[in-house]
C-alpha cells in the first residue's frame, strides 16, 4: 500500500479575474496565497482522469519567480487530500467531504507553476502530482478494525462490483448498466465484507445481449441520467475463492448530472474497450493527462523543482484537515 502514482498535468485556464496581491506580507496562510493554490487545485480536479476530487490541505512552499515584466510566475507545493466526490460528480470540491483517516485516507503532493499574464489575465498552469495512500500500519495503529484499502483490481473487489451491478440490472426494466470504473475497494471486518465504490454507465443493449457476450454494447453519451456512482458492501469471507452467488449486500447508486462534453467524457470512450480500474493507489507508472487540443503542443517544463528564489515566510502553512 506504499505504492505511488505520479500524475502529470498540463494546460491552461482562461479568464482569471482574481485580483492577486504579491506583497511583502504574503505567507502560506494569507488569502492571496490560497487564491493561487485554489487555481491549481481546480485545474487538477478538472483534468484528473479518474478516481476522486482532491481538496487543499497544506500550502507547503510558495515562491514568486523572476519574470519578464509581462507576467507573474509563481511556484508552489501543495498537499491535497482525497475527497468522497468522484471526478464525474458535479459537486464543487468545497462541498465534498474529505475522506477521513479511519476510512484509509489518500494524500496527493503537487508541484504547481502558474504563469499569469498581466495584460490578458490568462493563467497558464503546469502541475505534477504524486498520490499515495496512508500506510496500512498507520491505519491499524489508530483503528485496528477499520477497513483496509485494496487494489481496485483485487479479485474480491472486482467480483463484488460485478455481483452488485448484476443485482442492480435485474431490478431495472429496459435499462442496462455496465461498469465504467472501479474507484475503490476495502476489506471490512466484523462482519467480514468487501466495500466497493464504482461508476457505471448505461449501454444500448438489452439484458440478454449484455449477458451473451457476443453483442458489442456501447455506452450512451453523458447527460440524460446515463451515468451513476455506486457504493456497496458485499458480506462474504475473504477466504472464499468462488464468485459471489447469493450473498447479502447493501448498495446505493446515485445518478450523476454529467453534461455531454464534460472534461471526463474520456472515461466513456475508454469503456468501449473495457472498463477501467482507477490506478490511483496501485500503479507505479507516471501517466500524462490528455490535454485540450488547443494546448497539446505545449511542453511540460523540465524543471518543476525548487528554485533559487527563496519562499515567502510562514511556510508551510496551517493544516486545513489532518496530516498523514
Swiss-Prot record:
PANTHER family attached to this UniProt entry: ALPHA-2-HS-GLYCOPROTEIN (PTHR13814:SF6), FETUIN (PTHR13814)
GO MF annotations, alphabetized: cysteine-type endopeptidase inhibitor activity
Cysteines engaged in disulfide bonds, as pairs: 28-315, 85-96, 110-129, 143-146, 205-217, 230-253
Chief subcellular location: secreted
Subcellular location: Secreted
Signal peptide: 1-19
Keyword DNA damage (UniProt): no
Domain of life: Eukaryota
Its job: Potent inhibitor of hemorrhagic activity but also proteolytic activities. Inhibition occurs by formation of a non-covalent complex between this protein and the proteinases at their metalloproteinase domains.
CDD domains for this protein: CY
GO cellular component labels: blood microparticle; extracellular matrix
Alphabetical keyword list: Disulfide bond, Glycoprotein, Metalloenzyme inhibitor, Metalloprotease inhibitor, Protease inhibitor, Repeat, Secreted, Signal
UniProt-recorded name of the protein: Antihemorrhagic factor cHLP-A
Keyword Magnesium: no
Known glycosylation sites: 204, 282
Cited SMART domains: CY (SM00043)
PROSITE patterns noted in UniProt: CYSTATIN_FETUIN_A, FETUIN_2
Complexes and interactors: Homodimer.
Domain Cystatin fetuin-A-type: from-to ranges: 21-130, 141-254
Positions bearing the site annotation: Cleavage: 140-141
UniProt organism field: Gloydius brevicauda
Tissue and organ distribution: Expressed by the liver.
Family indicated by similarity: Belongs to the fetuin family.
Amino acid at each position: 500500500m506504499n505504492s505511488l502514482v505520479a500524475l502529470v498535468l498540463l494546460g491552461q485556464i482562461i479568464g482569471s479575474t482574481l485580483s492577486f496581491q504579491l506583497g511583502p506580507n504574503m505567507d502560506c496562510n494569507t488569502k492571496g496565497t490560497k487564491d493561487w493554490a485554489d487555481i491549481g487545485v481546480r485545474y487538477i480536479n478538472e483534468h484528473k482522469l479518474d478516481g476522486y476530487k482532491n481538496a487543499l490541505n497544506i500550502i507547503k512552499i510558495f515562491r514568486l519567480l523572476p519574470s519578464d515584466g509581462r507576467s507573474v510566475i509563481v511556484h508552489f507545493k501543495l498537499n491535497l487530500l482525497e475527497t468522497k466526490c468522484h471526478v464525474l460528480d458535479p459537486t464543487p470540491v468545497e462541498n465534498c467531504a474529505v475522506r477521513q483517516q479511519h476510512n484509509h485516507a489518500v494524500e496527493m503532493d503537487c508541484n504547481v507553476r502558474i504563469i499569469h499574464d498581466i495584460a490578458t489575465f490568462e493563467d497558464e498552469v503546469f502541475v505534477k502530482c504524486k498520490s499515495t495512500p496512508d500506510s496500512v500500519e498507520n491505519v491499524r495503529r489508530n483503528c485496528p478494525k477499520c477497513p483496509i484499502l485494496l487494489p481496485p483490481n483485487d479479485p474480491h473487489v472486482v467480483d463484488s462490483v460485478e455481483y452488485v451491478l448484476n443485482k442492480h440490472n435485474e431490478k431495472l426494466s429496459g435499462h442496462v448498466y455496465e461498469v465504467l470504473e472501479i474507484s475503490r475497494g476495502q476489506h471490512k471486518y466484523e462482519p467480514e465484507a468487501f466495500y466497493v465504490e464504482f461508476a457505471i454507465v448505461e449501454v444500448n443493449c438489452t439484458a440478454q445481449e449484455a449477458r451473451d457476450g457476443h453483442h458489442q454494447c456501447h455506452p450512451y453519451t453523458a447527460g440524460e441520467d446515463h451515468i451513476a456512482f455506486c457504493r456497496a458492501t458485499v458480506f462474504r469471507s475473504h477466504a472464499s475463492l468462488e464468485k459471489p452467488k447469493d450473498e447479502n449486500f447493501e448498495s446505493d447508486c446515485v445518478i450523476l448530472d454529467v453534461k455531454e462534453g464534460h472534461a471526463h467524457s474520456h472515461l466513456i470512450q475508454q469503456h468501449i474497450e473495457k472498463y477501467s480500474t482507477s490506478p490511483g493507489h496501485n500503479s507505479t507508472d507516471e501517466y500524462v493527462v490528455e490535454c485540450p487540443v488547443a494546448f497539446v503542443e505545449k511542453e511540460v517544463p523540465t524543471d518543476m523543482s525548487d528554485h533559487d528564489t527563496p519562499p515567502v515566510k510562514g511556510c508551510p502553512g496551517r493544516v486545513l484537515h489532518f496530516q498523514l
